[in-house]
């Protein structure tokens, strides 16, 4: 199948909400080794975000059930085995994406915007691995996630407007990483607040085509700040952080 047919297949799969098919088509496009267009890049990102998102959600549900069945050994064992099955699927998906990023996408990126997009993605997928990892493995995935986010962050500050949706989305996810993975609420809040304030100060640089995306992410940054501030004051809140 040539590239245009694979892209068309990915679009059909998206309409049908068959994200595994969508991811497979965009993986094949990526493996052809050309730099992806913005549209192709977004198709790849949406496909894998849905594929991995389903497993992350399942993992949380089963982990919660497992904790509630501590008194029943048989039920707990079943819960643990099922969680491990979901974990293996999640790890395979993340490793697939990370291989595409390292082998094709980051090295082929010619524009700073693309480089930031892919490094953010690398940070995200190592973060997803960190959520289910333990011991030395967790230390490695956490360090890899932070390194990718930090590199993306440095480039975005140098090369992109504070209102750019990719720069804002990176700040959003990097702050979630600090809050959820590193348990550093102060750093998370500082990062999110700085990104929000810098974007507000330059609202006049917002272009029409990205206005909706940028303002949505700014809203998520503000929502997270509100949630995190209330949690740190001792309120019991639902830790449903917004991510991009």
UniProtKB/Swiss-Prot annotation:
It comes from Gallus gallus. GO terms for cellular component: cytoplasm; cytosol; nucleus; perinuclear region of cytoplasm. This is 14-3-3 protein beta/alpha. The record marks 56, 127 as: Interaction with phosphoserine on interacting protein. Homodimer, and heterodimer with other family members. The modification Phosphoserine is found at residue 184. It comes from the Eukaryota. Keywords: Acetylation, Cytoplasm, Phosphoprotein. GO terms for molecular function: histone deacetylase binding; identical protein binding; phosphoserine residue binding; protein domain specific binding; protein kinase inhibitor activity; protein phosphatase inhibitor activity; protein sequestering activity. It is found in: Cytoplasm. Disulfide bonds: none annotated. Belongs to the 14-3-3 family. The modification N-acetylmethionine is found at residue 1. Phosphorylated. InterPro entries: 14-3-3, 14-3-3_CS, 14-3-3_dom_sf, 14-3-3_domain. Adapter protein implicated in the regulation of a large spectrum of both general and specialized signaling pathways. Binds to a large number of partners, usually by recognition of a phosphoserine or phosphothreonine motif. Binding generally results in the modulation of the activity of the binding partner. GO terms for biological process: negative regulation of G protein-coupled receptor signaling pathway; negative regulation of protein import into nucleus; positive regulation of transcription by RNA polymerase II; protein localization; protein targeting; signal transduction.
